[in-house]
A protein has these predicted regions:
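Extracytoplasmic ligand-binding site segments that recognize negatively charged/polar headgroups
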Residues: 25-31, 67-68, 72-208
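Periplasmic-binding protein-like
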Residues: 120, 184-189, 197, 228-252
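Paired acidic/hydrophobic, glycine-rich loop segments that form the ligand-binding mouth/hinge
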Residues: 68-72, 196, 213-218, 234
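Extracellular/periplasmic bilobal clamshell ligand-binding domains
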Residues: 293-334
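A ligand-binding cleft/hinge motif common to bilobed small-molecule-binding domains
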Residues: 77-80, 208-209, 213-231
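Short beta-strand->loop
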Residues: 88-97, 114, 142, 230-242, ...
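Mature extracytoplasmic/periplasmic domains
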Residues: 242, 251-309
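Early extracytoplasmic/lumenal segment of secretory-pathway proteins
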Residues: 15-80
């Protein structure tokens, strides 16, 4: 894991430090629109510890939370951290901007824990140049004309478990209650799957090289695919896209709990949410952010769309994670 320390203001005198564990991407834009403005407003120095979800959470667990004040995590890893007792309880009185964000983002894991600062969705991308028959439904992934033409995220990725849920629906069962039936549907789907992927860049490359005609993806991948393949289109399936969120939480034992809550509130503000949306870094959850059609392109934006999402029960997924991974590998590891 790479640890990056920034003193964005370049000052020589000592300042309070706020240590944030986050991803490494879009660092320059986050520095410009969030880190530097926050440092200036509160007279602090932000120190970043970067890496992927799994590596950062594992490091936090091994250190029992020491050395980090705030942590950004995707949904399933947020649930893991809660179960491990790694978060402080949030004082919502310090998050006055909560009243301005969509209900789905306010307390996705309960009132004691941090809100979502962005919302994403899992849908389908397909190449109109290769497919004359449009894709409109999750069930279309099983079509005969898609043999060896699609890619889906691996089970261990953020969006991976939604493939199991989709397979359950295809067989008209609850994947949580009847996983054998759901994985039976995945066996049927395997003939259509050229390969599974772990990184969004891999999916974009497969589209660009004409290897696949369709893929299941998070919406943030679409701009990259569209740039490489202008004939690609995004589909929110008629059954609804799956919601995914990223959260910010204060780490258990942090000496800077109140400052951390100020940071979370800052990120939820209308100005910051709009700046980040316009920079195409994250989709906004603040309801006061107004974007035109071009500005909203590639983002998950608007109450109507967000209200149409299918929820994902990460608690139930985490209970079944080992079993699901094992069943998945039996199908796709061969």
């Amino acid at each position: 894991m790479l640890v990056v320390c920034f003193s964005f203001q370049g000052t020589l005198f000592s300042k309070d430090k706020l240590v944030i564990s986050t991803w490494g991407y879009n660092g320059d834009l986050l520095k410009k629109y969030i880190y530097e403005p926050f440092e200036k407003k509160y007279g602090v120095e932000i120190v970043l510890e970067t890496g992927n979800n799994a590596a950062r959470l594992n490091k936090l667990k091994l250190r029992k939370g020491k050395g980090v004040d705030l942590i950004y995590l995707a949904s399933s890893y947020t649930m893991d951290a809660i179960e491990l007792g790694l978060f402080e309880k949030i004082n919502r009185a310090n998050l006055i901007n909560l009243s301005e964000i969509y209900p789905v983002a306010r307390s996705p894991f309960g009132e004691d824990y941090g809100p979502a600062y962005t919302v994403m969705r899992v849908g389908i991308i397909y190449d109109t140049a290769q497919l004359s028959n449009p894709i409109n439904s999750w069930n279309d992934l099983w079509r005969n004309d898609l043999r060896n033409k699609i890619s889906v995220p691996n089970i261990t990725t953020t969006a991976g478990p939604t493939i199991v849920m989709t397979a359950g629906r295809y067989k008209k069962v609850d994947a949580f209650m009847q996983s054998a039936t759901a994985f039976g549907a995945l066996k049927d789907l395997k003939q259509n799957i050229l390969k599974t992927y772990n990184r969004s860049s891999d999916l974009a490359n497969m589209f660009a090289q004409g290897e696949i005609a369709a893929g299941v993806a998070m919406n943030f991948v679409m701009p990259r695919v569209k740039k490489a393949l202008p004939s690609a289109v995004w589909v929110d399936p008629q059954e609804g896209s799956f919601v995914n969120i990223n959260t910010i939480n204060v780490v258990k034992g942090s000496p800077n709990k109140e400052l951390g809550e100020k940071y979370i509130n800052f990120v939820l503000s209308e100005k910051i949410q709009k700046d980040i949306a316009l920079a195409k870094v994250d989709s906004p959850v603040n309801v006061n952010v107004i974007l035109n059609q071009k500005q909203a392109e590639g983002l998950t934006y608007g109450g109507e769309l967000i209200g149409s999402f299918q929820d994902v029960n990460w608690g139930e997924i985490n209970k079944r994670k080992k079993n699901w991974i094992s069943q998945w590998n039996e199908i796709f590891a061969n």
